[in-house]
Amino acid sequence: KKQGIKFHMQHKVEKIKKNNEGAVISTTDKDGNKKDFDCDVVLISVGRKPNTNGLNIEAAGIELDAKQRIKTDKNFKTNLNNIYAIGDVITGPMLAHKAEDEGIAVAENIAGQSGHVNYDTIPGVIYTTPEVASIGKTEEQLKEKNVDYKIGKFSFMANSRAKAIDDAEGFVKILADAKTDKVLGAHLIGPHAGELIAEIGVAMEFGASSEDIARTCHAHPTFSEAVKEAALSVDKRAIHS
């Protein structure tokens, strides 16, 4: 907002037409409404697809879905008993750490163990300035499923470590179930967001509540105190806000 940037969510880009001033982007929103945007520069940063071309998959008899991803079962096995698939060529987020966990799970399954990947606790990090990280559900996803939830939010402006290094832009937001207090998701913008998200991932993996995080002693002064304060804020008990 400070930079005057506006976000138009859930808009599909239909076409981009160049002109002398830059370009015109034609879009359609989720309700079917069409809108054009006049732009100086267009940066295309999305649109990845699985690199399954050239693998001669058809000759092997491996089945693909409509998006050219390799079909697998819950154990990452394809329709052929001796072939497994993981990572960017199957469904799910195209993230290196997601693929790594899937590879470990496959090895465990082949060895007769019970390999498993919890896709609800796979973090995503955007390495910008400020850094952005997220895990679990978004507010939009919870609303779509009619899940009653609480929000805890804490600004880095009130975090001593962030203030000390003059990097206090951003916040930590935690979403918790309104009835059980179970942590459902989190979103962070600010210093070391990609590192701080791990604590919330561990909490979610163990089915922790926001109070579990809030009652865990965090060293002072650290960035992680913002996570604790956000957890306290879920029940409106933040200390330094």
Regions found by a protein language model. Give the residues of each.
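Rossmann-like dinucleotide-binding cores of NAD(P)H-dependent redox enzymes
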Residues: 1-33, 92-100, 108-141
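Short acidic-glycine loop/turn motifs at beta-strand connectors
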Residues: 19-20, 66, 178-180
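A short alpha-helix-loop-beta-strand transition element characteristic
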Residues: 63-66, 113-121, 147-152
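Flexible, glycine-rich terminal cap/loop adjacent to redox cofactors
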Residues: 128-138, 143-241
